[in-house]
Amino acid sequence: MALQPAAGARDLNPRQVESNRALSERLASVFRLWGYDEVSPPRVERLDTLMAGGAIASEDVVRLVADEPLGLRPEMTASIARAACTRLASRPRPLRLWASGTVFQSRAADEGGQCIEENLQCGVELFGVAPIEAEMELLSLLMAAVERLDFQAQHQPRLLMGHTGLMDLLLSPVPPVLRDAVRAALIQYDRLGLETIELEEGLRATLLSLLDCRGTPNEVLERLSSCFGAQALFDDLHRLCRQLQGPAAAQGVRLQLDPTFQPRFELYTGLVFQLVCDTHSAPVVVARGGRYDDLVRRCGAQPGQDFGAGFSLAIDPIRELLSDSSSNPTVAPQLMVAFSERSTLEAALERQRWWHQQGRSAVIELHPFSTRSLAEQQATDQGGFQLDWIDP
């Protein structure tokens, strides 16, 4: 029986690997322009670090059999935050870091049992900057990354934003014993569940109306102001969205604010966001991030420096998205150097070396061909190579 990869694992072909590398290099060039330094967090961490003090569920972590509790990272933020607060604690703030690498998440397979998902991410983390200034830099950087990726109009990119402070505001009139149930219903857009919770009739009606409160930031903030009055948080969000309007419009990114939006991992204690694009089948999340001050404090950051925010881009979905569009750059075809029976391998190797000096990719056929047509057929079979035929 042929060996199969583990459930959830994937074998990438050479073209996919090269595309992933090219995308990561594009993003890295943007991060460097903005003054971010590259780090390489370990794939294996202690479970208490990976679970971020309970913010990440234990079932999401791939555990390793070892003498101490270890696991594979489900994301890179916790590992980078730990490094920022320990080995890099003496470096001045703001501390700007970026990393690229594989993350592993565990989930239940459809047929039962464990399924391990392996994905490539590339992202940035900014430490030591309080709200809302860090978010203004990070989202501006995200727009610069979007420009470098060159999404197309058919992708309809949209930046969905939420804030834990907005959720706290929605829950403030709810009796404490009911807040967890109401919060779950709001996050899951569960209208029926919200209607069954024993709330005062006017409060239930308000929450049901706020369940549909999502749209342009100005419209949403105006509606929230009518319900909760003036709030400093509203001013911060207005400032952030005003700054984003120009860069987002230039890249065709639509801004959307949703007070009930909360991410899967409960790392975040401030702004949360994700960038969503359309595909032929369904929308896909290509970037996500937010503020995680509590995580930085748990890692031992000093008072006054206990701030952290960042985002990551999902390379594999972006690769698939761009491969379906015309945005991929045109590159010169790969060459195949082949020689006739009247020539020699030495001559072919010399020709290959010449092409490499010109910066062209060239492979070589190590055995002679009796005719040019056979060499052309081999070049086609090998993937549409351009033939360089040597026949003195």
Curated annotation (Swiss-Prot):
GO terms for molecular function: histidine-tRNA ligase activity. Pathway: Amino-acid biosynthesis; L-histidine biosynthesis; L-histidine from 5-phospho-alpha-D-ribose 1-diphosphate: step 1/9. Pfam families: tRNA-synt_His. Keywords: Amino-acid biosynthesis, Cytoplasm, Histidine biosynthesis. The keyword Glycosyltransferase does not apply. GO terms for biological process: histidyl-tRNA aminoacylation; L-histidine biosynthetic process. GO terms for cellular component: cytoplasm. It comes from the Bacteria. It is found in: Cytoplasm. Heteromultimer composed of HisG and HisZ subunits. PANTHER family: HISTIDINE--TRNA LIGASE, MITOCHONDRIAL-RELATED, HISTIDYL-TRNA SYNTHETASE. This function is generally fulfilled by the C-terminal part of HisG, which is missing in some bacteria such as this one. Belongs to the class-II aminoacyl-tRNA synthetase family. HisZ subfamily. This is ATP phosphoribosyltransferase regulatory subunit. It comes from Parasynechococcus marenigrum (strain WH8102). The lineage of its organism: Bacteria, Bacillati, Cyanobacteriota, Cyanophyceae, Synechococcales.
